[in-house]
UniProtKB/Swiss-Prot annotation:
GO terms for biological process: cyanate metabolic process. The keyword Zinc does not apply. Catalyzes the reaction of cyanate with bicarbonate to produce ammonia and carbon dioxide. It is an enzyme of class 4 (lyase). It catalyses: cyanate + hydrogencarbonate + 3 H(+) = NH4(+) + 2 CO2. This is Cyanate hydratase. One of its GO terms (molecular function) is DNA binding. Transmembrane segments: none annotated. It comes from Synechocystis sp. (strain ATCC 27184 / PCC 6803 / Kazusa). Belongs to the cyanase family. The active site is at 90, 93, 116.
Length: 149
């Protein structure tokens, strides 16, 4: 990925995935975890349990010596502040354009607070459309009101 530092373990995992011809959707079926979460583990943006790490490595035909790295707390955030990858940049652009409007609508509906990125799921779906397939991204996070003291 241009402009993004990819760790050696991520490269190894992605190469094994490609060599096996396995998709993230395949891994979802094999591991019983969402494909986006599995991709986050591979990119070291999420941590797996020992059991999850062992299953992932087994599916990819890799040895268990990588388990400690996959189960360690991960350092969150990849790439430059302003992303350079075109697809990732679109999400940055969406937040630049719709971030404040989204914030205001959330505050109207829930009050003063934030959406959790910890108690959170993210789903990606493909929707067929005669004018061109559509990407459907659903973010679902727990609302966390600001505490008063």
């Amino acid at each position: 990925m241009a402009g993004t530092e990819i760790s050696a373990i991520t490269t190894k995992l992605l190469e094994a995935k490609k060599a096996k011809g396995i998709t993230f959707a395949d891994l979802e079926q094999l591991l019983g975890r969402d494909e986006v979460w599995i991709a986050a583990v591979i990119y070291r943006q999420a941590s797996a349990s020992v059991d999850e790490a062992e299953k992932l490595l087994h599916c990819l035909g890799l040895s268990d010596d990588l388990v400690p790295e996959l189960t360690a707390p991960s350092v969150k955030g990849l790439g430059p502040v302003v992303p350079t990858d075109p697809l990732i940049y679109r999400f940055y652009e969406i937040m630049q354009v719709y971030g404040m409007p989204m914030k205001e609508v959330i505050h109207e509906k829930f009050g003063d607070g934030i959406m959790s990125a910890i108690d959170f799921t993210l789903d990606i779906e493909k929707e067929a459309d005669p004018k061109g397939d559509r990407v459907k991204v659903t973010m679902n996070g727990k609302f966390l009101p600001y505490k008063k003291w």
